[in-house]
Curated annotation (Swiss-Prot):
Primary location: virion
Propeptide stretch(es), residue numbers: 1-31
Source organism of the structure: Fowlpox virus (strain NVSL) (FPV)
MF GO annotations: structural molecule activity
Entry's family note: Belongs to the chordopoxvirinae VP8 family.
Name of this protein: Core protein VP8
Pfam families the UniProt entry points to: Pox_VP8_L4R (PF04498)
CC terms in the record's Gene Ontology section: viral capsid
Record note on modification: Undergoes morphogenesis-associated proteolysis which cleaves the 28 kDa to a 25-kDa product. Proteolytic cleavage of major core proteins P4a (A10L), P4b (A3L), and VP8 (L4R), which occurs at a late stage of core formation, is required for production of infectious mature virions (MV).
Superkingdom, natural source: Viruses
Protein role: Major core structural protein.
Marked site (Cleavage) residue numbers: 31-32
Key words of the record: Late protein, Virion
Length: 253
């Protein structure tokens, strides 16, 4: 049981805490109370935004592909599924694509976890400090590939314009490429209406993507683990491979 507790990756400390007072107030006003599912991004204290003070500028109308990354343990925990029970595809869809979910963050081609962690250069005294651990060796990571059911409008906040005095809700069924930390995530609003989980992957012991196509493959994957921890540097390598292999959407800004 103690080993299982170690897999709760989304602990009390954020990997990047450089938030100004104004940014904190904006986060609270724009989405801190919204209903959204947890993922790997929770360890970075990412709170999706459901409101904005800026006009939205259209950047594209096309089908999109992004990923959500989590672990078997954390999905079971968030769904209140006993650890000795099996997680199903239906459970995953229920958690991420329920009609009550207001917004979901997708990692796309514009995303870099190194930048999300502030990308601060290390000082000489801390040069031997290890990178933060993204996955523990006892983890069973899940990479959920999400595709839009059709072409959707994707916007970016036009921060060259003067902000309005009031926050306004962002319309459902659209994507907004949002800046978090020093990188970008694609926020999909009311994802149940526009997204589908097209493919589920795990990671094998060689840190390569392992496609989980059937219910039996998903069941069997939950009985194993990756065997060794994955730090931020290694995860960035894995994620860069994902970008190419999974053809994640990449937006010109």
């Amino acid at each position: 049981m103690n080993d299982l507790l170690l897999e709760n990756l989304f602990g009390e400390k954020a990997l990047c805490a450089q938030v100004t007072r104004d940014q904190l107030l904006e986060i609270i006003a724009a989405g801190a109370r919204s209903k959204f599912p947890k993922s790997l991004l929770s360890m970075y204290r990412v709170t999706p935004r459901v409101m904005t003070r800026y006009p939205l500028k259209l950047i594209t109308n096309e089908s999109i592909t992004g990923v959500v990354i989590t672990t078997v343990y954390n999905l079971k925990k968030n769904l209140n599924i006993p650890q000795n029970n099996k997680l199903t595809t239906q459970d995953i869809e229920r958690y991420y694509l329920d009609k009550s979910v207001e917004v979901i963050n997708l990692m796309v081609g514009n995303t870099s976890l190194g930048d999300l962690a502030c990308g601060r250069p290390r000082r000489t005294k801390s040069s031997k400090k290890k990178d933060p651990v993204i996955f523990l060796g006892i983890s069973a990571p899940l990479i959920l590939v999400m595709n839009s059911k059709k072409s959707i409008n994707t916007y970016i906040q036009d921060k060259k314009s003067d902000p309005s005095s009031d926050y306004v809700n962002i319309n459902p069924g659209i994507g907004v490429l949002e800046n978090y930390g020093n990188t970008y995530l694609l926020d999909i609003h009311n994802p149940s209406s526009v997204l589908t989980i097209s493919t589920i992957y795990g990671l094998d012991n060689n840190m390569e993507l392992k496609k989980l196509s059937t219910a039996s493959e998903i069941d069997a994957y939950q009985d194993v683990n990756i065997g060794k921890s994955v730090d931020l540097k290694k995860f960035n390598e894995i994620f860069n491979t994902m970008k190419k292999h999974l053809s994640l959407s990449n937006f010109s800004i």
